[in-house]
Amino acid sequence: MEEVIVTSAIIGKSASEIADPIHIVSGDDISTEATQSLGETVDDLLGVSSADYGSAVGQPIIRGMSGSRVKILDNGIVNRDVSGLGADHFNDLDLGNAQQIEVVRGPSSLLYTNGTIGGIINVVDNSIAMEDVEQLVKVGGETQSVNEGNTTTFFYQDNLNNLNVSFAYKNTDLENYDVPNGAIMHEEEEHHDDEAHDEHEEEHEEHEENVGFLSNSDFASESMKFGASVVSDNGYLGFSISSSESSYGIPFHGEGHEGHGHGDEHGDEHGDEEEGHDEHEGERIFTNTDSDKFDIKGSYDLDGFNFANSVDFFYRDSDYSFTEQHAEEEHEEEEHHDEEEHHDEHEGHSEGPTTFTNDSAEAGFIFDLSNDLYSQKVSFNLVNEDTAIFGSEAFMNPASREEFTVGYYLSRSFNGFDLDLGVRYDTIDNSGSVTSAHEEEHHDEDEDHHDEDEHHDEDEH
């Protein structure tokens, strides 16, 4: 039987030699599973779970920590999306061509990025080949009955005149997934008069909804990636271009609009429980994402130099946008057309989209200083990142961030013990604007005055 050696791209050791808390999920295990989120892919591992928010969103949790405490890496480089800014924001990574997924905890995680108290998850593919490849063609298809979903994949790689090229494509279309009748329960607030209130002993009553499917649980995405590299005795050099678009619903997000903090006020204004429920019954909450990345990556053997064995280097330019929007079905819009101005009176009930953008450029070097006694690496990173939020639910002003970091990792085994040490120094410069409380109050007064003018005009008519 042929021996298969799995090596960590982070530490550079085989799985049997690694003393760090690390899990490696192979590409074969990923490809045999149904299309699912990153969190669901790794939640069977020890100490790892997933915070699911529909079929598209599954944020990994490592040792009880998630969000900004767990960093997601794409081929050793931080995936700079906006998944850390909301529970319903998904990790924008394509697992269709993943060679392996590494879950790393411990000192070695500090070598690649800051804020990794929980750990890192590194998704590795072979788009920029580090060794010469042979011709390989893969065509795949998947059908899911629970959501009438279909997924098609295509992968091609070859060595053309000493140039390694690869192309990967994936298209996924999943509809709302089926649930047993009566599986979805709602808690409705009592808005009846005292006579109706006396008929019920509890403030809330539960009722079953025979819908047969979970609304806003759909997911659709399309991604492609092209890479090329040249390999020599001294190392390799290559580049890759990737693009992905996705759209997915956010289930249970809009019931009574409780998650937006104005459901009670809106319900009280209507006064009738049934009417308030029907108003949001056909609401559609969905998200669109768009991501483009350009990578340059390579490695050079420094044999003959006394200070280092080799140096790995990379550069990435990425543009990412995430748009969340509320909408109502056509019949609902017609039914409430006359109440359109009335809805605008309630602060925060705007149906306009909210867009998150993140544009970043990152460069780094990792020097291998290992010898026969110990393994050690030193990294240098430079990041320039611009983040902005626009729209009806924007909660921060545009901001720019510049980082310069130095990381150090040391590992040594002696007398049956393993010593691992990680050190990281960060210089971070944040710039942006601050909206004062006085400006916010003045803005609210202007909105209230504008609403009063609209009411006055309505009374005249």
What annotation goes with each model-predicted range?
Residues M1-S31, G67:
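Short, acidic, small-residue-rich periplasmic hinge/interaction motif at the N-terminus
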Residues Y374-H461:
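Signature of Gram-negative outer-membrane beta-barrel scaffolds
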Residues V78-R105:
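Short acidic/polar hinge/loop motifs at secondary-structure boundaries
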Residues G96-Q100, R105, L110-M185, D218-E222, ...:
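Outer-membrane beta-barrel translocator/receptor signature
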Residues G39-V78:
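Extracytoplasmic beta-strand/coil segments of soluble accessory domains associated
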Residues S215-S217, S221, G235-V311, D317-E332, ...:
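Flexible loop and strand-edge segments within Gram-negative outer membrane beta-barrel domains
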Residues V139-T143, D158, F167-D173, V230, ...:
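Transmembrane beta-barrel strands of outer-membrane/channel proteins
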Residues S145-D173, M185-P251, F286-D303, S370-Y374, ...:
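Transmembrane beta-barrel wall of Gram-negative outer-membrane proteins
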